[in-house]
Curated annotation (Swiss-Prot):
It catalyses: tRNA(Arg) + L-arginine + ATP = L-arginyl-tRNA(Arg) + AMP + diphosphate. It comes from Staphylococcus haemolyticus (strain JCSC1435). The keyword Nuclease does not apply. PANTHER family: ARGININE--TRNA LIGASE, CYTOPLASMIC (PTHR11956:SF5), ARGINYL-TRNA SYNTHETASE (PTHR11956). GO terms for cellular component: cytoplasm. This is Arginine--tRNA ligase. Its main location: cytoplasm. SMART domains: Arg_tRNA_synt_N, DALR_1. Transmembrane segments: none annotated. Its EC number is 6.1.1.19. NCBIfam families: argS.
Amino acid sequence: MNIIEKVKSTLIEEIKASIEKANLAEDIPEIKVEIPKDTKNGDYSTNIAMVLTKVAKRNPREIAQAIVDNLDTSKANVKQVDIAGPGFINFYLDNQYLTAVIPEAINKGDKFGCAEESKNTNILLEYVSANPTGDLHIGHARNAAVGDSLANILIAAGYNVTREYYINDAGNQITNLARSIETRFFEALGDTSHEMPADGYNGKDIIEIGKDLADKHPEMKDYSDEERLKTFRQLGVDYEMDKLKKDLADFNVHFDNWFSETSLYENGAIDNTLAKMNELGYTYEADGATWLRTSDFKDDKDRVLIKKDGTYTYFTPDTAYHYNKINRGNDILIDLMGADHHGYINRLKASLETFGVDSNRLEIQIMQMVRLMQDGVEVKMSKRTGNAITLREIMDEVGIDAARYFLTMRSPDSHFDFDLELAKEKSQDNPIYYAQYAHARICSILKQAKEQGVEVTADADFSTITNEKAIDLLKKVAEFEPTIESAAENRAPHRLTNYIQDLASAFHKFYNAEKVLTDDAEKTKAHIALVDAVRITLHNALALVGVSAPESM
């Protein structure tokens, strides 16, 4: 339990004891102690007096006063308690208790902020899962940045996480890919009689694949149509996936599993899933098609599994895939999907309910659109016309760190304008530069201290830390583990980037307010330990969102 949680726990116990002592309630509701946004309202605050109004049948301020009158504050380092507004109880603490976070950070190093105990919960996190039909674009980039950061945060919070990419390599889009490659293949051989499919792919990468195959395997022109299509399907997927994997790896995004949709057909998983749903009585025939009774489970209508022509809908392999995820021993499934998948949420949840699986075990996060902005003008993108701004181009334009950080800064369910010019600025206006500069500045201070013979020590006299800005900085360091926990529980990586900005800001304010290296040897040792704790925290926080922490800039 981290320092903040210990204080909260102690305060809750003392508030509970006070309520019992004052005979305000027999069944005491949940007591919440929070950190106020405005420090003028104390270090911690609770609204329990207002919660108890109906039970105690008294004015909330009277209830608050009764709680305060019977409160033992000695165990929680409380130096002052006041009542504010309609009945908030605000606690002001002797902030020396916060200094315990300094040796904790120094001693734990890279593990600082991480949960000490496993939650014994298996999470399968599926993200990106772009069709292997072209380059990754800005929407995929956001999905990748958020997904990878979320995986890191969940692991730090004590969850067992499997990162998975679902390869859509069995649908009509792969046939269109193969036909598109075929057209470019014959064009490279001087044959323009093969028309591009209406839903074909016109990107430069398809032209390159066709030319490469024509150069290396011109004999494929003599294959039967069926054999050539089968070959181009596999070669196209392999080519696109190799490129996609490299782009993601360069973006510092890695997966534990690459799950092929085709495998669901080959190993009989789809047939077995259909048989199971039929056995359970949730399928029926109508209008020549096979349907699933998803409306029994809060979907707005039933869904087709097998069309009139005997082919599967996209929903069928998706159902088999999610049932497979559950059968692999995962407690929670998290899917990050594009904005165009909003209608999929209820039907996928309903499909799991048919197997007796609690649909709450499936969490689907819809990723909203990103607009690339340059000089105040939107940079348009169109994947199939070959004009898309790719992940590779974004990395080359602004750098991996800036791209990762910017794409994680906002809640994934909100639209986001990515300012390309701001991402490249070397100024305090650029969030990633501001955060990384704080880390580099600390490294410079530590180097200077070492040259003066001052080493980092975890047992300095921290009572010398009294400056208001230093205390604010300590509070931010102490909030690191609770922030990780909050970001994990709410599946919200942007909470961590917000925290990084606040921590960097708190450090810069401290640096501008007080000298780190002073004439007082003991105070200097304490300051050096403090800024090293900040360095460790910044390094670990940046790592969780896939960003480097440079030692110089």
